[in-house]
């Protein structure tokens, strides 16, 4: 698949404006195709970014703690089914084996995956598996809680529904006590 030119993308926006009954040549919409293309470049900037590159700076220290938990990483993504936003928080825990990363690196991983067309279930797995693959901890737990515009703006019109997804690797997948501890900790905030 070849990537369309910027002009082709702008023409596609004009076509969508016509489809909804708007006139793309009216004053308020003249620059809209450019704005949409610029917005999409930022919103979907997660494509082509390498998680391994983000996680390449590791600290190999004796860990004086058992678990590492980072809560409330805020994100906004777009569902691949309707291209409508969903937003929420990500909680990440891992049990280090011999290395850790700075906490901003975990937030950057969330941003990489959130800035793509997504489904929440897949994003949860991608975050957990990328931490597992790159840090090789004893285990990883990821929980995402999100509100989906495709549920609130259309269809069933449920604006208070929150979807929760979890994915576990290593000792979190193998031992219930670790999962239980993680879920209890994330519920306390």
From Swiss-Prot:
<keyword id="KW-0554">One-carbon metabolism</keyword>
<feature type="binding site">
    <location>
        <position position="150"/>
    </location>
    <ligand>
        <name>Zn(2+)</name>
    </ligand>
</feature>
<dbReference type="Pfam" id="PF01227">
    <property type="entry name" value="GTP_cyclohydroI"/>
</dbReference>
<protein>
    <recommendedName>
        <fullName>GTP cyclohydrolase 1</fullName>
        <ecNumber>3.5.4.16</ecNumber>
    </recommendedName>
</protein>
<dbReference type="InterPro" id="IPR018234">
    <property type="entry name" value="GTP_CycHdrlase_I_CS"/>
</dbReference>
<feature type="binding site">
    <location>
        <position position="79"/>
    </location>
    <ligand>
        <name>Zn(2+)</name>
    </ligand>
</feature>
<dbReference type="GO" id="GO:0005525">
    <property type="term" value="F:GTP binding"/>
</dbReference>
<dbReference type="GO" id="GO:0006729">
    <property type="term" value="P:tetrahydrobiopterin biosynthetic process"/>
</dbReference>
<dbReference type="InterPro" id="IPR043134">
    <property type="entry name" value="GTP-CH-I_N"/>
</dbReference>
<dbReference type="GO" id="GO:0006730">
    <property type="term" value="P:one-carbon metabolic process"/>
</dbReference>
<dbReference type="GO" id="GO:0005737">
    <property type="term" value="C:cytoplasm"/>
</dbReference>
<feature type="binding site">
    <location>
        <position position="82"/>
    </location>
    <ligand>
        <name>Zn(2+)</name>
    </ligand>
</feature>
<dbReference type="GO" id="GO:0003934">
    <property type="term" value="F:GTP cyclohydrolase I activity"/>
</dbReference>
<keyword id="KW-0479">Metal-binding</keyword>
<comment type="similarity">
    <text>Belongs to the GTP cyclohydrolase I family.</text>
</comment>
<dbReference type="GO" id="GO:0008270">
    <property type="term" value="F:zinc ion binding"/>
</dbReference>
<dbReference type="InterPro" id="IPR043133">
    <property type="entry name" value="GTP-CH-I_C/QueF"/>
</dbReference>
<comment type="pathway">
    <text>Cofactor biosynthesis; 7,8-dihydroneopterin triphosphate biosynthesis; 7,8-dihydroneopterin triphosphate from GTP: step 1/1.</text>
</comment>
<comment type="subunit">
    <text>Homomer.</text>
</comment>
<keyword id="KW-0547">Nucleotide-binding</keyword>
<keyword id="KW-0342">GTP-binding</keyword>
<dbReference type="InterPro" id="IPR020602">
    <property type="entry name" value="GTP_CycHdrlase_I_dom"/>
</dbReference>
<dbReference type="InterPro" id="IPR001474">
    <property type="entry name" value="GTP_CycHdrlase_I"/>
</dbReference>
<keyword id="KW-0862">Zinc</keyword>
<dbReference type="GO" id="GO:0046654">
    <property type="term" value="P:tetrahydrofolate biosynthetic process"/>
</dbReference>
<keyword id="KW-0378">Hydrolase</keyword>
